[in-house]
Regions:
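RNA-interacting cores
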Residues: 1-200
């Protein structure tokens, strides 16, 4: 990828019984899972083959820790049925608004009054062909909350939890396989489908 290219993939890490501290994460088991999504088959195939090449090899991640890839498998994404879906954010949602005049960033969360507008603006950037559907979509964010994460030495505001979205079926499926928000390739915005249904 060229630095300015938008990277068409996303990922999330699942730890078992994690405890988060200011300078470390303690886990209940010595294994974890990584979910990797790529909406384009060719991109997914390239990464999957790369993963297999490094299977069973040690990767040192700190002075006293290393990780080993023990298994990799392809899982077909479930299709959303209907126009309403309940999603879980497996990795935090980042909505970034950049001010070119002073070169600063604002990160919008579910606690901000303009969350819905900024989220829709972000979706239109990533899914321009669904612009009208995005205008008409409805969201329930009552099960979401604001959080703060450390990203390359900076603390940024994010949103976590479960979101319900009522929108065009094709848009919902596109959001599921492509992920949403900003910084997807850095491990943000990956959605997991909990359930879907048709709302009249």
């Amino acid at each position: 990828y060229i630095k300015s290219d938008e990277k068409k993939y996303s990922w999330a890490v699942k730890f078992f019984k994690p405890k988060f501290f200011s300078n470390r994460i303690e886990v209940g088991k010595n294994n974890f899972e990584i979910t990797f999504k790529a909406p384009k088959t060719d991109v997914g195939t390239i990464f999957f083959n790369s993963f297999l090449e490094y299977k069973d090899k040690e990767f040192k991640i700190s002075e006293n820790n290393f990780i080993v890839l023990t298994d990799a498998k392809i899982v077909n994404e479930k299709k959303i049925v209907g126009n309403c879906a309940r999603f879980k954010f497996c990795s935090p949602l980042v909505i970034r608004e950049h001010n070119r005049e002073d070169n600063t960033d604002r990160h919008i969360t579910v606690e901000d009054e303009d969350f819905f507008d900024k989220f829709k603006e972000n979706l239109k950037i990533h899914f321009p062909s669904f612009s009208n559907s995005i205008d008409n979509m409805k969201m329930d964010i009552s099960e979401m909350k604001k959080a703060v994460v450390l990203f390359y030495g900076l603390y940024i505001d994010v949103s976590l939890g479960i979101i319900i979205i009522n929108a065009d079926n094709s848009l919902l499926n596109e959001m599921l396989i492509s992920s949403v928000g900003s910084k997807n390739a850095s491990g943000f915005g990956l959605l997991q489908l909990i359930e879907s249904w048709e709302m009249i």
